[in-house]
């Protein structure tokens, strides 16, 4: 076997196993949680045109600025439409690619560690085979650990996978840049040779692409500084540290721009609002606890959840054993590794990578209501995984040094490794099943966090989608007992009441939601719908207009406003709103049908026929559209076509008296014409 190809075979092996284990995710559906706003109802990604690219790059959407992620979702939609299989397939392929890159990057870094270490350094136990062992173990851990399921099985977390891809490629290109330089201390190199090295520029480009995918990549400049310190050993003095920092200036500038845009984007949806209510001291304690908890979940991946609620303020104090132990652990471990770094730097370097890559999402700048999230560990986990890989290689080296029992030790090591792969694969499959759909996901959330409002709200939404209204109401009430000022829960409870035709209660809930969150466009639209059902049309129109002032691209509000205008006999205004709705959502059969009905009233029969046909192209079994099309044909005296449509209506709705009556009229006219 060609020795140069072995790393690629190993990487492909780890990647293929990862891909195979994740295949059951292809059966998963979208989930309402973010998949809705990222893909399902995101009309912008439905067209790959100049308007889409302008949208992707020019503003903040869903509290984020990550244009490359939007482009990725748009490409998926262009190929797969709203078939979740294709979107999940892309995620799985990206994760498998990242696993492939992890193996190759680990081999490259370990080889450079060995090349640049002193003869008596710890890296001397790493020969070619042991480097492959360390990299292979790291890659399998990265690919199969259930902590990463959230990033892969959740379509909306495409940003993790894309960011990870370009993050890894940037480090790999930077390592090539280091290899291209003469193996000398940094202070002896000219700046020009550093900044105009092709690999350096490639690394910078990949970093920018990572930022355009997810701003969590902002930590990369510090990671590169850390690599310069160890294992590249380019930083040997304060001057070389300064020069290394100067070399990273383009990265730092890009990171600062991305960070600024991210904070601005998060503020548009109030995601950073929690900062004002959680004291910095409490956030620091929760962050310290998260550092420890994440390591625990790497070591023993049980109790994983898609939502870890933020602790209540009175629970977060230094006298609490949980937080005191966490602070002692983080500070103590850091101190021990700093002392140990005089002889052995690899542990501090790996710990530093873990801390640095977690800091942007650890909660010091609090975003959202979660204390931690599995998805945040997608890149930081590499540090601990690589250490585990090195331990496996060290055990193999010790086995090689034994005069007797070497085969036994190696056999036990292989057996443990196989058992680990099987166990991780099983745990990953279990987590993939949790992400099957809204119901399985929210049920798991409630089971693991019964005292948090968001899981109950999500379960209520899942019940609402299944039309299990009493159970939905129960869950929304449970959420509001835990968080009475939760506007989203009030809005969803209003939706459940509206479906039960309890309109007064629905109106009350929508009004409560709007008192808590005045810029809640969905609540305005839902309140308008409730008013419309109560025949309070002026109030309904007012609410739909309020929703559209907040969200001009809100297709459903345009549609609802069109219906309200139609009921008020304001036909031209109704036409305007239906057309506006269809520009945003051209595949809405209801809007085509209702627009056609308005055209019928205006005696614009050709336009009416066009709209009814458009509705039926989208929804062929829509009996109302068939009936309306038949009526339009009847008015045009196109009797055979009208007969065909009314017969189709009766096949779909055999007891439709109006269709039967119109069919008889058609037959009578045909007799008269003969």
Language-model-detected regions and their locations in the chain:
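Terminal, low-structured helical/coil segments at or just beyond the last alpha-helical repeat
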Residues: 643, 647, 655-674
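Conserved alpha-helical positions within TPR/SEL1-like repeat arrays
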Residues: 454-465, 488-499, 511, 522-533, ...
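Short coil loop/turn residues that delineate tetratricopeptide repeat
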Residues: 444, 448-451, 485, 519, ...
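Polytopic membrane enzymes that build or remodel cell-surface glycoconjugates and lipids
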Residues: 1-495, 522, 526, 560, ...
